[in-house]
A protein has these predicted regions:
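Sec-dependent signal peptide recognition
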Residues: 1-7
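N-terminal targeting sequences that direct proteins away from the cytosol to non-cytosolic compartments
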Residues: 5, 16-108, 168-169, 184, ...
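Hydrophobic h-region of N-terminal signal peptides that target proteins for export
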Residues: 10-16
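A short acidic-to-branched-hydrophobic micro-motif
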Residues: 101-128
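Second-shell loop/turn segments in exported
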Residues: 112-120, 145, 193-198
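Signature of long, low-cysteine stretches enriched in small and polar/charged residues
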Residues: 131-181
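Glycine-rich phosphate/pyrophosphate-binding loop shared by adenosine-nucleotide-utilizing enzymes
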Residues: 187
Length: 216
C-alpha cells in the first residue's frame, strides 16, 4: 500500500509540475496577461475566452448517484471543500495543502492545492491542460478527456488507459483553477488504484469526483 501511494503521489506531482512551470512564465506581471486572467473571485466557472470546449455539468449515472447518496460527507474545512466517500474509506492525512483518503482495498482519493500568483493565467493554463490531455488521448495514454463543471468550478477530467502491468496504478483525475479567500489556486483531485482493481471502482471514482461541493 505504501509503495502504491508513494508512486501515486509522485505521479500526481509529475502530471502537472512541468507544464505549470512553463505556465508560470506566462503570468509575468498583471499588464502582460490582463486579457486572459479571470476576475472571478468566488471560484465559479470563468467565461470561456481561450478556445477550450464548453464544459459540461457533472452528470453522475444512476449507479454513481446511488454511490453519492449512500456516501459519507467528508469535509476539508481548510479549503472549504467536501466529498461523499463510500463506506469504509479512512483519512490518511489532511493538511492545508493536501487531503488524502484510502479505501479498505487500497483505492485512494488524493487532493492537492497549489497556491499561485495573483496574475497567474488560469484560463490559459486550463486550456493548456486540456490540449495536453487531448494529445495524451491520441497517444493512447488516456481513455477519456473532457471539460467538466463540478459545483461551479470548471476543470479537465481524464481517465488513464489500463496500465501495461495490472499492478501499476491507474488514475481518474480532475484539474481545475479557482479563486478562494483571495488566493489563486490549482485544485488537483485524483482517484487511483492499481490497474487490476480499477474496474471495481469504475463507479466509485466518478461519484467521488462529482460529489464535490465547494464553499463559494
Amino acid at each position: 500500500m505504501k509503495s502504491l501511494l508513494a508512486f501515486g503521489v509522485l505521479s500526481f506531482a509529475l502530471t502537472f509540475c512541468g507544464l505549470q512551470d512553463k505556465l508560470k512564465g506566462l503570468s509575468g506581471g498583471p499588464a502582460s496577461n490582463s486579457n486572459v486572467t479571470s476576475n472571478n473571485s468566488n471560484g465559479t466557472a470563468p467565461p470561456n475566452t481561450t478556445g477550450a470546449p464548453t464544459a459540461e455539468k457533472a452528470k453522475p449515472s444512476v449507479t454513481q448517484q446511488a454511490v453519492i447518496d449512500g456516501g459519507t460527507e467528508t469535509k476539508w474545512d481548510d479549503q472549504g471543500l467536501s466529498w461523499k466517500l463510500p463506506s469504509g474509506w479512512k483519512k490518511m492525512t489532511a493538511t492545508k495543502e493536501s487531503f488524502n483518503y484510502s479505501s479498505p482495498d487500497n483505492a485512494f482519493l488524493l487532493v492537492n492545492i497549489s497556491t499561485l500568483g495573483d496574475s497567474f493565467p488560469m484560463d490559459v493554463s486550463l486550456k493548456a491542460y486540456y490540449d495536453q490531455a487531448m494529445q495524451q488521448l491520441k497517444n493512447g495514454k488516456y481513455e477519456s478527456v473532457k471539460m467538466v463543471d463540478i459545483d461551479g468550478i470548471v476543470g479537465v477530467e481524464f481517465v488513464e488507459a489500463p496500465p501495461a502491468s495490472k499492478d501499476d496504478p491507474r488514475r481518474h483525475q480532475w484539474i481545475a483553477y479557482r479563486k478562494y479567500l483571495g488566493q489563486t489556486q490549482q485544485l488537483n483531485v485524483m482517484t487511483s488504484t492499481k490497474g487490476s482493481n480499477f474496474g471495481k471502482h469504475s463507479d466509485d471514482f466518478p461519484a467521488i469526483l462529482y460529489s464535490m461541493k465547494a464553499v463559494k
